[in-house]
Amino acid sequence: MDDRGRRCCTHSGVIALDIEAKWQNAWDRDGIFVPKMDGRKKFMITVPWPYTNGSLHVGHGRTYTLGDIIARYKRSRNYNVLFPMGFHQSGTPILAFSERIRAGDRSTIDLYTSYLKEYGEKDIDALIESFKDPKNIADYFSNAIINDFKHLGYSIDWTRRFTSADEFYQKFVQWQFRRLNEKGLVKQGRYPILYSLEDDNAVGEDDIKDGDTDKVTIEEYTAIFFRGKSFDLIAASLRPETIYGITNIWVNPDVKYVKVKISGRMAVVSEECSTKLKFQGNEIEVAGEASVQEIQKQTYTTPAGKEVKVYQADFVDPDNGTGIVYSVPSHSVYDYVYYRKKRGKDFPVIIEAPMKMKDIESKYDLETEEGREEATKDLYRNEFYYGKLVDSGPYTGMTVREAREAVKRDLISSGNAFTFYETSRHAVTRSGSKVIVAVLPDQWFLDYSQPWLKDLGHTMINTMTMHPEVYRNVMNDAIDWLKERPCARRRGLGTRLPFDDRWVIESLSDSTIYPAVYTNSIPLRSLYETGKLDDDAITRIFMNGEPKNEDESEAKRQFEYWYPVDIRLTAIPHISNHLSFYVLNHAAIFPKEKWPAGLIISGLVVSNGAKISKSKGNVVSLLEIAKKYSADIYRLYVAVQADISSTMDWNETDLASITRRFNEFKDLMAGFKQDTSDLTFEEAWFVARFSVRLRQFMESMDRYQIRDAYINIFYGVLNDLRYLSSRGGDVNRALTPVIADWLRALMPVIPHHAEEYWHSYVSDTYVSVDPFDENFQDRYERTVRRFGMTCDQMYSAMDYVEKVLQDVKNIMQVTGIEPKSVEITVANADVVRAAQEFLNNSVSGQSKKYMQYLAKRRKDIMIYGFDEYDVLQRNQVYLSKQIGCPVRIERGDVINGKIALPGKPVIYIS
């Protein structure tokens, strides 16, 4: 252990605030979470560095709290733990918010004013003014988050912190991109991207409001021309194979439509679509409005030669596709609902599939939006996987999968259609700017489609620790799905692309292998400040080559010691982006021995059953948690409210329940007085039970089953103490031999109170870095040995007593007898020996007289490692008290035709 962990912490040197503030200051003052390289096994854990455009809330806190619990647990098992943290200051959100403040945008100013009030700032106007510089936003919230994390008791090594805006780190990112480029993974070309209209810039998941939990993807539509006499209509579809089932075209009477010149034609689309067409590289010219009445005056011819009319429908969304929809009632739920209202139920069926529209109508409530949405998904899925085309010209007989690509290809090649890109849902950036799909002719992107890279990614995923295991296949699927990914933008904060400095590397691409820099950020920064950090130096440090100076040597030593990351913990929404990029960039850059060793993927967080959002009024900030609820209660809530993979619901009902048990624990500790006198049988049982619980706790924690671990070691031990007290045991005497290990076990979740009680009752070292004695089991075995049992036997003995007691109560309930006395006869030595021989199929002559009984009752035989008579005799008073009459314990064999079996005594009530 580092000497820092053993240093005495006198109370006079600690700021006398409340328990949590006191120990936060003490830990920080003595730097106990700043590890040094030593001979112990190392453990490096990372969680995503926070984005610094605002305060964090209870949902964010779950990930960081789980990471800290694991880091603290590993320290308790004598690992040399590195739990570092930095800050993500790249991308467009910070810049966009700053620009909105400069422009005097009231909603943005109000938002940041609310943040500053929460942090208790006085000169808010001056701070808002300073936020016109985006760097000031990033730096302010970086510092605020440090304080939030300290208030929650996170055991982070802050000496290694850096940001994605730090110039030495940007040198590292440029080195990374040069290596990716050398491997043929960085490319430039025409590519569709998510784009912010107001910011005039590409955006990614990190830039989009709710982009991490409600994904926005790019969908490829087929925009089809329908020829008219004066002008054409363009309708975009994800299902071009349905073109042979068209009955009509829908337009929305409340939408503004415009005529555009495109591909040598005059065509009509919604005004919103005309903007999107421009950004997708189409040469168009808007030639004026087209009224709905004008559109409906003429008929239109499909590419298959069918003439159709235009009808009005208010479900048509002007901001989705072209704002014009061609109707296929047999194969579109919305078309079906609207068409039958206007024209009845006579329409062609051009896809044969197990599920028909009549099945959909009986299964779902098509009068509701929710019903139509669910029905649409079900129908599309069924037809895609099982459908075949009929009455569809040359495509008849094809599967839907085959026909979709064939029809699209033929329509485009004949000039009757073109590709149009649309977002999978309406989206805005974090600063409120509308997001569309744009096609840039010179976009830089990372090519994740390379087979060799995917093979390496799969190898990494299939050989690492994965919790929960179910996500291994999900991660492999995400790797398979990933193709080209835009990696740079024209504007925003971040690192300049090294081979084209007009572009800034986007915020998901500059934060893939950054955990490597945690290992040696201090010497790397020193190298940069002395002008010695170039690509060659970075290669020598992170790859091959002899270091050329002391800073390089130190940087390489630390990297070699700490890397790879042993556990990366993040939330499920990051699988398709952060985690996939993390895996593939490590695979591309580093040798296998430096690949991440493990991933833990946590579930989502809701508040009172609803998604966390300001509009719902259920946002609880990390600062508010520490002030209002206490850090340790929040940490305990995170640990026990849900297992890692499940959704955690932050709600007052569960919080109140957890708080009550926590207060019970505090009352227990406040009244504790050490007592080293001899233990009674019941108190020895508690020690034995604790020994078993502690072993189970460690097994659960080693599997990252945090909820199970703390239900056991926190609630379970409290319940055991209640039971002990009901048996007349002395809680103080029972706790004395286990209190140190109990506080060590509780420390990862309630570190402040564990530290307080540790210093009060155990030692002047820090429990946060005072590990378990790996031979703790021997110590507890010695404690209970004087009762002639092992810990497991002692634990089983009390369960046996309760089982016998329950058998007595069951007999009383069935017979209705109010007992005056109870006689319990346990198997004597002859029966026990006979039962052992019977179970081993080696019956001696002396034992044969019991065989007729044993053969009938084989399933009831339970041979314990303790003397049943002795155990029941020790608990005779307890049994008498519980039953309400005298209890006598005897040894015997056959009583009134019933045999006393091992584990199943004969009970006689009178």
Swiss-Prot record:
Belongs to the class-I aminoacyl-tRNA synthetase family. This is Leucine--tRNA ligase. GO terms for molecular function: aminoacyl-tRNA deacylase activity; ATP binding; leucine-tRNA ligase activity. It is found in: Cytoplasm. The gene is leuS. PANTHER family: LEUCINE--TRNA LIGASE, CYTOPLASMIC, LEUCYL-TRNA SYNTHETASE. GO terms for biological process: leucyl-tRNA aminoacylation. Its EC number is 6.1.1.4. It holds the Pfam family tRNA-synt_1. One of its GO terms (cellular component) is cytoplasm. A motif ('KMSKS' region) lies at residues 611-615. Its main location: cytoplasm. It catalyses: tRNA(Leu) + L-leucine + ATP = L-leucyl-tRNA(Leu) + AMP + diphosphate. It comes from Thermoplasma acidophilum (strain ATCC 25905 / DSM 1728 / JCM 9062 / NBRC 15155 / AMRC-C165). Keywords: Aminoacyl-tRNA synthetase, ATP-binding, Cytoplasm, Ligase, Nucleotide-binding, Protein biosynthesis. It is an enzyme of class 6 (ligase). ATP binds at K614. A motif ('HIGH' region) lies at residues 50-60.
